[in-house]
C-alpha cells in the first residue's frame, strides 16, 4: 500500500491505495493535517510518493516555493517514521498515463476514468446511491491518483494504453 500526495502550498491531496488499485482513503486537506495523515498511515504504507516540482524555465512565485517547502516537510516526516519516499514529476505522469507529454489534467482524468470506471463512463464518479470508482474525487484528488498510478507503472505494475 502506498500514500500518494499531490502537494500544494496550503492544502494537499492524497490517495492511499494498494497494488491492486483499491483505494483505502482519499482527500484534500490542510498541509498540517497531511503530516497527521502521514503519521496515521505509516507503517501500513511503506512507501510515500510525492509529486515533485520541476523547473521548466519559467519564473515562479511564492506559492511554488512554499509547495517545495511542504514537499520537504512531508519527506522528512515520512522518512523519520521509516517509510521509503519516492517522487514523480508531472511529465512522468503524462507519459505513464497518456504516453504523451502534451497531456493535460483533462486527458489524464479521461485516461483514469477509461481505466478504472465500472459503470459511469462519463465522470467515473457515479452517484451516492450507485457510486463508481472515483466517487468523492475532486480536482486535486485526481492528481494524487495520477501520482499513484505513475508510481505503480514505473515499477512494472503495468497500465493499459489510453
Predicted regions and their residues:
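Phosphate- and other anionic-substrate recognition elements at nucleic-acid/protein interfaces
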Residues: 1-162
